[in-house]
Amino acid sequence: MRRSAVSPPWGATLADRQSPIRGLRWVAAATLVASAAVAHAQPAVIFELGGKFDRSFNQAAYQGAERWKKETGKPYLEFEVQNAAQREQAARRFAERGASPVVGIGFPQASSIEAVARDFPNQRFAIIDMVVALPNVQSFVFREHEGSFLVGMMAALASKSGKVGFVGGMDIPLVRKFLCGYEQGAKHANPKVQVIASMTGTTPAAWTDPARGAELTKAQMAQGVDVVFAAAGTTGLGIMQAAKDAGKLSIGVDSNQNHLHPGSVLTSMVKRTDLAVYEAFKGVKPGITALGLKEGGLDVAMDEHNAKLVSPAMLKVVEAAKADIISGKLKVVDYTVANACR
């Protein structure tokens, strides 16, 4: 039995055309060029459950691929996973077609990227939110606790009840990492604030259950929560809708989700999976690439949709904390390193 090159999670979420090969449905982001040489030069991206238009994690990755396409004028290949079995099938089929790099979006794809990268050592691969320790793989990981700290501060400063909420997707170390950073930030801004947290579930289905997200949000609001952080993939759409319906505030994640409910979304903790995909498409650099506030891999979203919700005083405090985290003056505990939030 070979030794796995996949490290534990640092973090970790449509329609395509029918193919006779293994029943998979394939979509090319642009018309495929007949020349084999050109086809072999094409990069490929495999989106995780929820699809490239999930308005969250996958969609940010899609935007990175589209940015590369627009800048280079070149096409890329894509596939949207519908079930677990398709992850390795998609990666292997792309590799067989000569695609390079093949980029897996999300930690659930790590084992498939590892297996296929071993079998195609002369091609390049990339994985987001996991470490695959192979010489032809670039692993992108994020310091999500840093960005979560900032939105935690904003939640505490915006709260009138002194109670802020967190609804996570799948209960895994990655989501606990978000929660831990959020709680630290909230208590940094207001030591007396109460943080009420819920997890949607323990299986990947927790990322795509807006109805359950809405239920958990309503339960928190019944306890007095008036700001809730939705760190739950597509499930977050239900969380944010429930907050809006109750006249409360929500915080988006991964993509800038402020526009989904203008005047109700306090901010979004933007995680630049778009940057990771864009950089991988430009050229894989094997090894680990860590992205945080300093590298521009994370940030809070400010735009016309939430400008009236964030006072100049609040923004000033948050920007000061951001600068202190970047300089190292302010340390934020990483749950996945400490295995605790303390």
Residue ranges and their predicted role:
Residues 4-30:
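Bacterial N-terminal signal peptides that target proteins for export
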Residues 40-342:
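A residue-level marker of the well-folded mature domains of exported/periplasmic proteins
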